[in-house]
Amino acid sequence: MIDRYKHQQLQIGSVSPQQISAWANKILPNGEIVGEVTKPYTFHYKTNKPEKDGLFCERIFGPIKSGICACGNYRVIGAEKEDPKFCEQCGVEFIDSRIRRYQMGYIKLACPVTHVWYLKRLPSYIANLLDKPLKELEGLVYCDFSFARPIAKKPTFLRLRGLFEYEIQSWKYSIPLFFTTQGFDTFRNREISTGAGAIREQLADLDLRIVIDNSSVEWKDLGDEGSTGNEWEDRKIGRRKDFLVRRMELAKHFIRTNVEPERMVLCLLPVLPPELRPIIQIDGGKLMSSDINELYRRVIYRNNTLTDLLKTSRSTPGELVMCQEKLVQEAVDTLLDNGIRGQPMRDGHNKVYKSFSDVIEGKEGRFRETLLGKRVDYSGRSVIVVGPSLSLHRCGLPREIAIELFQTFVIRGLIRQHLASNIGIAKSKIREKEPIVWEILQEVMQGHPVLLNRAPTLHRLGIQAFQPVLVEGRAICLHPLVCKGFNADFDGDQMAVHVPLSLEAQAEARLLMFSHMNLLSPAIGDPISVPTQDMLIGLYVLTMGNRRGIFVNRYNPCNRRNYQNKTVDNNNYKHTKEKKPYFLSSYDALGAYQQKRINLHSPLWLRWRLDQRVIGSREVPIEVQYESLGTYQEIYGHYLIVRSVKKEILCIYIRTTVGHISFYREIEESVQGFCRAYSYGT
């Protein structure tokens, strides 16, 4: 459908019978209305032409060949002549054959049929609205029992029998035996109700606003009662309150969308266009047909049988009519969702038929494979890997992908700079991978964002914009902080990259879709750009330090047992003899690490600014080391204090590693950058 802003969109919901007939009905020049499929046939076995009023009828769904009717007559499509648009003999419209991809038909059901999605899928919408158990409604739909109509102060057959509303199940087989078809119809229309028609009547009698009011009052009453002291009763009340909330939300949805609840019961069954359920002839003259055709045939056969029982047969017992209505209901259930009621229907080769639900759901369904999974131009796909040196808003594109995505822009750049006289020469330069090509590609990519998408796109953050940079290799590099929004990890996941072409799309990508603009979850507002998986492991490795500690002696808890037992191996003895380095600043420590004088986890002493928390601490030093000049060092668990002869604090050293220093500096620079940006903004 197309809305008032001329946006194409797809809307899924229940449809009225009038809308279904409007989709299919066509009026011929002689006044005949076509659109109803009444015969279960497909093609004639001799002529290989579609059967009239069948599942592939050309009058209903359009011609197989453009501009050629079933008689073989030809008309020019779109010619402004006074020739009739319909063939006078066969009634086929002279139109493009592509109409068979969207022209629908319908089957007029002899009895109402419930839509199995609304009845059997959990939660059951019909059971929620009617506030009745699902098992009871199933028995009513499949004609296992009936209920009495409320007829006040009138003599009825049921009153003579002394029956009440839910006692008719025992009369399931006895009541229909007393009546022929006409008599049973009269009795049923007046006194009892069964099948999907009973559900339709109850849904039509519902006042949704009264349903909301009654449910709200009951919910408040249950809330005012408080706890009963019985755990089982409290759970029962809690489940009832949850049910009432779902019922109110469902009723509000029907009111908001202006949908009548009785639409959940079908009177007209839509028939899909023939091109969506084709019959194909393969080698050897054999035919391959879609399973949906066989399921439609099953529905039409049973529906026609029920129509004959109701119209032509005068002596058919009412029990047979009820059984046939049940068969029609089961056939429609199988068409919509095969196997939802138990054992699925199978063909002669014991293969399960693919119903309408099987066609549209899943990874290979109509939506995900055909509609959402289309191949588009200016797009690529590759495996994602970690880009540790990337900023949050950047992604690394392999040269092979980037040159293909931005090839047209590079060609334009080569021609504008007079490096190529035409498109052919520009393409040859790109194929030869000349150095000037990569320079122009860099210029093009600087001002052009790209979109990264990871399927399935379940929420808004499944597609985000990034500033691309060229990287070596064949994998897309990604900052690990954006993985949570994509629900991605680096174990072989693939992502698609798209190039926004129009200026509007590029502006939208920059203003709304850049990764650094989507730091919070749109659903709950919590931070979504948080360290996960690989990044947490990296932070752990960076800050785990050395288990031996800065002192390998009796003061270290890790080695106290070894000291007591006097069993120190050679490796520990070597560390004991090593003197731990002292550094005046973090720059000196990082420089020593880059020169490979120390390791990432090597313990060291780093001079630190005077901290009042350290100065005022009451912690007892582990060891005190005196020097020849009178100064001494008080060694604690995680720091040491250098004091003068007069016991004044000269300086403080903390025990740390290069990994801790790197982590601290990254956080410090980030906080300072945020503060500067905030001060500029204010």
From Swiss-Prot:
Q: Which GO terms describe its cellular component?
A: chloroplast; DNA-directed RNA polymerase complex; mitochondrion
Q: Name one Pfam family in it.
A: RNA_pol_Rpb1_1
Chain sites annotated for binding Mg(2+): D489, D491, D493
Q: Which GO terms describe its molecular function?
A: DNA binding; DNA-directed RNA polymerase activity; magnesium ion binding; zinc ion binding
What subcellular compartments does it reside in? Plastid, Chloroplast
User: What cofactor does this chain's UniProt record say it requires?
Assistant: Mg(2+); Zn(2+)
Catalysed reactions, semicolon-separated = RNA(n) + a ribonucleoside 5'-triphosphate = RNA(n+1) + diphosphate
GO BP annotations, alphabetical order:
DNA-templated transcription
Disulphide bridges, residue numbers: none
Which Gene3D superfamilies does its entry note? 1.10.40.90, 2.40.40.20, RNA polymerase II, clamp domain, RNA polymerase Rpb1, domain 3
Q: At which positions is Zn(2+) bound?
A: C69, C71, C87, C90
Keyword hit for Cell wall biogenesis/degradation = no
| Keywords, comma-separated and alphabetical | Chloroplast, DNA-directed RNA polymerase, Magnesium, Metal-binding, Nucleotidyltransferase, Plastid, Transcription, Transferase, Zinc
Q: How is the cofactor bound?
A: Binds 1 Mg(2+) ion per subunit.
What EC identifiers does the entry list?
2.7.7.6
> What HAMAP family does the annotation carry?
RNApol_bact_RpoC1
What protein family does this chain belong to?
Answer: Belongs to the RNA polymerase beta' chain family. RpoC1 subfamily.
Q: How does it assemble?
A: In plastids the minimal PEP RNA polymerase catalytic core is composed of four subunits: alpha, beta, beta', and beta''. When a (nuclear-encoded) sigma factor is associated with the core the holoenzyme is formed, which can initiate transcription.
Role description = DNA-dependent RNA polymerase catalyzes the transcription of DNA into RNA using the four ribonucleoside triphosphates as substrates.
Q: What is this protein called?
A: DNA-directed RNA polymerase subunit beta'
The species is: Acorus calamus var. americanus
